[in-house]
Amino acid sequence: MIQQETRLKVADNSGAREILTIKVLGGSGHKFANIGDVIVASVKQATPGGAVKKGDVVKAVIVRTKTGARRPDGSYIKFDDNAAVIIRDDKTPRGTRIFGPVARELREGGYMKIVSLAPEVL
């Protein structure tokens, strides 16, 4: 579960390395974010020469969580880290590459570009 002030790894080549969650989008009662949810975040670490700089406020979609997500068949999917991909307003990623596996739940959320760029979909 990702909440306010949670730090996440960035799983793309947009230039950011680490982001800090400012707000979970999705209504007033939405306190925690899971896989496929959109957050507003601040860039805390960035690589030089990247598209985003340290201090930028960006939107990102969660692609991996340590807590994991429950599937309709009763199984759970868990990852080793909490990671997100920085997106534009039209749900397309800012970067051109995705690093590491992503969850299948992104397909139902309409993030087909992220799913197609990912090296592995679990």
Swiss-Prot record:
Signal peptide (UniProt feature, chain positions): none
GO MF, one annotated term: structural constituent of ribosome
PROSITE patterns noted in UniProt: RIBOSOMAL_L14 (PS00049)
Record Gene3D superfamilies: Ribosomal protein L14
InterPro entries assigned to the protein according to its UniProt record, in alphabetical order: Ribosomal_uL14 (IPR000218), Ribosomal_uL14_bac-type (IPR005745), Ribosomal_uL14_CS (IPR019972), Ribosomal_uL14_sf (IPR036853)
GO CC terms, sorted: cytosolic large ribosomal subunit
Swiss-Prot/TrEMBL keywords: Ribonucleoprotein, Ribosomal protein, RNA-binding, rRNA-binding
Pfam families (UniProt xref): Ribosomal_L14 (PF00238)
Listed GO biological process terms: translation
CDD domains membership: Ribosomal_uL14 (cd00337)
SMART domains associated with the record: Ribosomal_L14
Keyword Ribosomal protein among UniProt keywords: yes
NCBIfam families per UniProt: rplN_bact
Purpose of the protein: Binds to 23S rRNA. Forms part of two intersubunit bridges in the 70S ribosome.
Homology family: Belongs to the universal ribosomal protein uL14 family.
Quaternary state and interactors: Part of the 50S ribosomal subunit. Forms a cluster with proteins L3 and L19. In the 70S ribosome, L14 and L19 interact and together make contacts with the 16S rRNA in bridges B5 and B8.
HAMAP family named in the record: Ribosomal_uL14
Protein name per UniProt: Large ribosomal subunit protein uL14
Organism: Streptococcus pyogenes serotype M2 (strain MGAS10270)
Gene responsible for this protein: rplN
